[in-house]
């Protein structure tokens, strides 16, 4: 019995150019123009599949973590700041518990 390969040859797919392809338009809105230009084609495709996977999982009723690139820039910045606040508060708590003599 022959096995068929289900892998996709990205170089030979017959899709529209990425500028007009809906999937790339959906993803490009999460990046600045400069960031988008710096991404390789394979990175762009990875983001397309990450978004599709997230959408599929949530449509099935599963709880999934929103990919970082899909979060708003403000929300990501606040998250990073709150994480750094947590680290510094833990460090200060440790210093109070174990004072240096």
UniProtKB/Swiss-Prot annotation:
Residues 73-101 are annotated as: Disordered. It is found in: Nucleus. This is Protein SSXA1. The keyword Coiled coil does not apply. It holds the Pfam family KRAB. Could act as a modulator of transcription. The lineage of its organism: Eukaryota, Metazoa, Chordata, Craniata, Vertebrata. Residues 87-101 have a biased composition (Basic and acidic residues). GO terms for biological process: regulation of DNA-templated transcription. Specifically expressed in testis (at protein level). Not detected in other tissues tested (at protein level). Its main location: nucleus. GO terms for cellular component: nucleus. Residues 19-83 form the KRAB-related domain. It comes from the Eukaryota. Keywords: Nucleus, Transcription, Transcription regulation. InterPro entries: aKRAB (IPR003655), KRAB (IPR001909), KRAB_dom_sf (IPR036051). Belongs to the SSX family.
């Amino acid at each position: 019995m022959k096995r068929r390969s289900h892998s996709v040859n990205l170089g030979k797919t017959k899709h529209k150019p990425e500028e007009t392809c809906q999937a790339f338009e959906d993803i490009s809105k999460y990046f600045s123009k400069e960031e988008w230009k710096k991404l390789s084609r394979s990175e762009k495709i990875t983001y397309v599949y990450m978004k599709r996977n997230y959408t599929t999982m949530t449509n099935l009723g599963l709880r999934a973590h929103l990919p970082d690139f899909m979060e708003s820039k403000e929300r990501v910045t606040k998250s990073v700041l709150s994480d750094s606040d947590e680290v510094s508060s833990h460090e200060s708590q440790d210093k109070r518990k174990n004072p240096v003599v």
